[in-house]
Amino acid sequence: MQIFYKSPFRKFVKKQTRSFQLIIEDEVEKTTISPDMCASKKGDLVEFRVHKFFYGKQEFLIAYRFQEAEILFFTIGPHENFYRELKRYLREAG
């Protein structure tokens, strides 16, 4: 299975501490092992799945798209304004 990362995902991870980067790496690995564990979103984000995890007391979300042989990670961030930022990125990249 091939794994690809979009630039917002890479930029967010690059700015974080090493300990948080390792946790993100573990969460990405969990997602690649069973990519269909998360439910698909509804509405205009229907092709995306979102994986949720906690770091400290903060909830973070990872948005990804899963197809037969590849996983494409789009963005990662705290729950606050997450879907708004994802939609903005899709409009600008669109």
What is each stretch, according to the model?
Residues M1-E27:
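Arg/Lys-rich, positively charged N-terminal/basic patches that mediate binding to nucleic acids
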Residues Y55-L61, R65-G94:
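Enriched for short, Lys/Arg-rich terminal
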Residues M1, R49-H51, I62:
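Residue-level detector of beta-strand structural context in well-folded domains
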Residues K11, K30, N81:
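Active-site micro-motifs of SAM-dependent methyltransferase domains
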Residues E29-G56:
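A short, surface-exposed loop/turn module that caps and links secondary-structure elements
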